[in-house]
């Protein structure tokens, strides 16, 4: 979402970003429209004390940048990023427009899980102070917004907003020809045996004996996930462990017929998730296959989209019909782009400042 924001608004406003260095091998995102400060490499294998010290230094570095540049507005993503914004808003720049966005929805109970101490501490700063002084607090869809406002009744409708994570207009494919000799499926994103149906889906692929090809692009996965897939020895499954750069996804999707979602949806966050991959598949003209446990997609009016959106009951072994039927999809009615979302966001801020 940050990349789409920069690409959409970089020519209209001065943007500065403070973030950690990523731990994967993909080239870091860059954009001349924004100054991006990357400090301290993300490393989940280090001790909790090391992570805490690194977090404090990162927060102080970010606070220094805020004091130095005196922004008109501050936007942070997720509770884990709240601390430097809290310090700046409370003690330095009290007039700054504070904006908060949640790409993920977390219940109050989830902040108490093992390994969430930093997020829980930051969330206490949000509930005790930041929510009371924020100009904007957003979730990605109406369902999550309603859940969030039920958790945080101190937030008003005027402050709590919706900021979907749609892909940019440059990804748009007005027409999509499905004419592959076999059905080609693609999955992009994180994987685990615990939280996704990737193994069950791969087992089904293996049984199709070449009717379906499945390519996986993921750099964020558990070793046992890769081991389980490789153990199938299926020639129609290819696992690309290097993942794919975000900017290269549109051209990659041109090769495929179907984008697959595989979440088991064990949490409210995933049950009511319009995952960004859903719209990235649709904007490219791909059909979408998803598990029935994804409640929001199950309840959605899918007829407004031209590609076929098909529900799977994976636990019962019910998968889509893979009979090949070449066709052309007229995707011209698709109208959900990041540019419109962030333009509305900026108009809101301008009104607040005016």
Indicate residue ranges for each PLM-predicted region.
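N-terminal subdomain of nucleotide-sugar transferases
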Residues: 1-24, 69, 164, 203-210
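N-terminal strand-loop element at the rim of the active site
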Residues: 7-54, 144, 219-225
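Short His-centered aromatic/hydrophobic patch
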Residues: 76-81, 103
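A short, active-site helix/loop in glycosyltransferases that binds the activated sugar's phosphate group
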Residues: 115, 120, 127-160, 167-169, ...
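Conserved donor-binding/catalytic core segment of Leloir-type glycosyltransferases
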Residues: 138, 167-171, 176-196, 202, ...
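Nucleotide-sugar-dependent
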Residues: 192-196, 243-249, 259-280, 289-298
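Nucleotide-activated donor-binding/catalytic signature segment of Leloir-type glycosyltransferases, i.e.
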Residues: 225-258
